[in-house]
C-alpha cells in the first residue's frame, strides 16, 4: 500500500485495493462527483468492476483516515500492438481533494502493479483538448503519445463531452525503467503547426491556419486552447470543434510522419502546446 498526505486538507490517504460491493458502489458515487455525471449509463456497473477484479483487473481506491473513498482508478489487462499492458479506463478524485497529489499516487501504484505483473506499460486515453490532463500525463508522469483515436466513445451528452466528438490521445507509460518527467519547455527549433488569433472582445484564441510538417523538422509544437471549457461556453462549441478538427489533422499527420508527443508546455498560458520529437 502507498501513503501520502493531502496538502489541501491535511488528510492522510491510503492507496489500496477496493474491496466488496459497498466500496464498489462508493466508486460509482465518486464517478458521478468527479465528472459531474448525471446519467447512469456512463457509470461503471458494480458487476463489471467485480467481474474484472476476479480475472486480473485492478481497482485501486484512495481512502482517508475515516476510510472514506476520495479517489479511485479502474484498470484491466489489455493488448496494444502486440504488447501486454494494463489499460487504465478511469482515474477520478473527489472534487474536494483534486490537485492534491492523489491522482499521482493512484497512477504510480497502477504502474507498480503493472510492473509486478510483468506488463510492458500502463496505457490510458485522455481528451487532448484538456490542458490540465495533458500537463499531468506528459509533463508530470512522463507518459508519451503516438496514437490518436477519432471519436473513441461515440457521441456523449455529459458536461465534459457534449457538443464534441470523443477524440482521444493514448498515453503510454512504460514499466521497464524508472519514470522521468516529460519535457515542459518549448523546443528552440520547434515548428508550430497550429496558428491562432485572438477573438476581439472575448479573449480566447481560435484556429487561423495549419502549417504542413517540414520534411527536415526534428521537433513540433501543437497548440491547444488554454481553457477549453470557457471557449465552449462562449462559442456554443463551434470554436471548440474547429480546435478539435485542427488537433485531429495535425496529430494524425505528425504520428504518421514518425513523431511522438513527449511533453507539454504551459510557457504561454493562453495557448499551451504539446511537444513532439521525431523518432523515425
Language-model regions, residue ranges each:
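A conserved beta-strand-loop-helix scaffold within acyl/acetyltransferase catalytic domains
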Residues: 15-95, 265-267
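Short coil/turn segments at alpha/beta junctions that flank glycine-rich nucleotide-binding fingerprints
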Residues: 38, 100, 117-118
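Intrinsically disordered, low-complexity, positively biased terminal segments
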Residues: 1-7, 20, 117, 130, ...
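Residue-level recognition of the GNAT/N-acetyltransferase active site
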Residues: 94-96, 127, 225
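Conserved GNAT acetyl-CoA-binding A-motif
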Residues: 114-127
Amino acid at each position: 500500500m502507498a501513503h501520502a498526505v493531502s496538502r489541501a486538507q491535511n488528510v492522510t490517504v491510503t492507496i489500496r485495493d477496493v474491496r466488496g460491493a459497498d466500496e464498489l458502489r462508493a466508486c460509482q458515487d465518486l464517478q458521478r462527483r468527479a465528472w459531474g455525471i448525471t446519467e447512469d449509463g456512463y457509470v461503471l456497473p458494480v458487476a463489471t468492476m467485480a467481474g474484472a477484479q476476479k480475472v486480473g483487473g485492478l481497482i485501486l481506491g484512495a481512502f482517508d483516515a475515516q476510510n472514506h473513498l476520495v479517489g479511485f482508478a479502474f484498470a484491466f489487462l489489455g493488448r496494444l500492438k502486440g504488447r501486454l499492458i494494463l489499460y487504465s479506463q478511469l482515474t477520478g478524485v473527489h472534487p474536494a481533494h483534486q490537485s492534491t497529489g492523489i491522482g499521482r499516487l493512484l497512477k504510480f501504484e497502477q504502474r507498480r502493479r503493472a510492473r509486478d505483473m510483468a506488463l510492458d506499460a500502463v496505457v490510458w486515453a485522455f481528451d487532448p483538448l484538456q490542458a490540465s490532463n495533458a500537463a499531468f500525463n506528459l509533463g508530470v508522469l512522463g507518459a508519451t503519445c503516438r496514437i490518436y483515436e477519432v471519436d473513441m466513445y461515440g457521441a456523449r451528452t455529459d458536461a465534459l463531452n457534449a457538443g464534441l466528438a470523443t477524440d482521444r490521445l493514448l498515453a503510454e507509460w512504460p514499466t521497464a525503467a524508472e519514470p522521468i518527467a516529460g519535457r515542459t519547455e518549448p523546443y528552440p527549433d520547434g515548428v508550430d503547426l497550429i496558428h491562432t488569433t485572438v477573438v476581439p472582445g472575448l479573449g480566447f484564441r481560435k484556429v487561423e491556419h495549419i502549417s504542413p510538417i517540414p520534411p527536415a523538422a526534428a521537433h513540433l509544437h501543437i497548440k491547444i486552447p488554454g481553457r477549453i471549457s470557457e471557449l465552449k461556453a462562449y462559442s456554443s462549441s463551434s470554436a471548440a470543434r474547429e480546435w478539435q478538427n485542427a488537433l485531429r489533422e495535425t496529430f494524425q499527420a505528425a504520428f504518421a510522419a514518425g513523431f511522438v508527443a513527449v511533453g507539454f508546455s504551459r510557457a504561454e498560458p493562453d495557448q499551451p502546446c504539446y511537444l513532439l520529437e521525431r523518432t523515425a
